[in-house]
Amino acid sequence: MTFKRLALTISLFASASLGHAQSNELNIYSARHYQTDEALYADFTKASGIRINRVDSDDAGILARLKAEGTASAADVILLVDAARLWRGEHDGLFQGVQSTVLEQAIPVQLRSTPDASGKTAWFGFSTRARVIVYDKVRVRKEDVDTYEELGEPKNKGKVCIRSGSHPYNLSLFGAVTEHLGEQQAEQWLRGVVANLARPPKGGDTDQIRGVASGECAIAVTNSYYLARLMHSSKAEDKAVVDKVGVVFPNQSSWGTHVNIAGGAVARYAKNPTNAVKFLEYLASPEAQNHFANGNNEWPTAKGVAINNPALKAMTGGTFKSETVPVSQIGKNQIKVQQMLDRVGFK
């Protein structure tokens, strides 16, 4: 059952199917549509005895549903895949704050929400995905795409492929650039990116990588795990794509590469809040963190967790410098970013 197939008018009835409040249950609304997460849920149930009931949608659909359901919502845990949407859920009053020493010690402060006056935290990031630059190793020199700023420079005119500017992955990147450069300079940069497009924005991140390999463009912006999936693939056509492209983790000499998060929160009207916190604490454990790394090619957020994913290690040697700006601040920049996109004509 997915929200994409359900109208909001029947959401209250669908909520009932998730089960009533019981001490051995947990109801999750999840935007993580990854088959590999099934092992994550199974391991939690095996360790805790808590049965998981889950409904899948996208970030926007989940937030809309929570608003529509109000106090009748069955949701205990909310899992979203974008920092800006987590920020929006917090500021729309859809989450309840959590005090957990386990989570506070495990998750870096910049990858969770700012605590409220009572010291409670609304959401935590449990994995990161880097927004990287992929380039044609024949047509482009690596030193010409070492920074995000270079995406907007004249030397790269007609070379850039990127998905829609209003997609959450790009909104978060643009929000980060705005935080680092300031609004005026960020808008000038966006104008430069638009001027450098090889074609109008279309498709998903994998399409951008394939566009570089096919020669449609020479530079693309993508989340790191899309490239990692191609690197893990046994298909000849995917191997050919990987052979043709190089990857850059931008701004290693300045503020670091932008990372977005997948994170979780306890729903405001959770009927099983204790189980919800147990689940969030489980997501910060080494076992769960390695599920994210090995199952979906994401980087763990918990401190001190070692990973053993060949594709991630091949990209970076296992580590890279990421930005330290709080992801909650990036969410606050979303309105500014959308206005800038409208002004520069970035569709």
Each language-model region and where it sits:
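Periplasmic solute-binding protein
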Residues: 86-94, 116-146, 174-175, 259-264
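Short beta-strand->loop
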Residues: 29-32, 96-105, 118-123, 135-137, 143, 149, 236-258, ...
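Mature extracytoplasmic/periplasmic domains
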Residues: 262-324
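Ligand-binding pocket segment of bilobal, Venus flytrap-like solute-binding proteins
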Residues: 165, 169-172, 176-250
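Extracellular/periplasmic bilobal clamshell ligand-binding domains
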Residues: 308-347
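A structural signal for short loop-to-beta-strand junctions that line the ligand-binding cleft
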Residues: 73-78, 96-133, 149, 160-162
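Early extracytoplasmic/lumenal segment of secretory-pathway proteins
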Residues: 22-88, 347
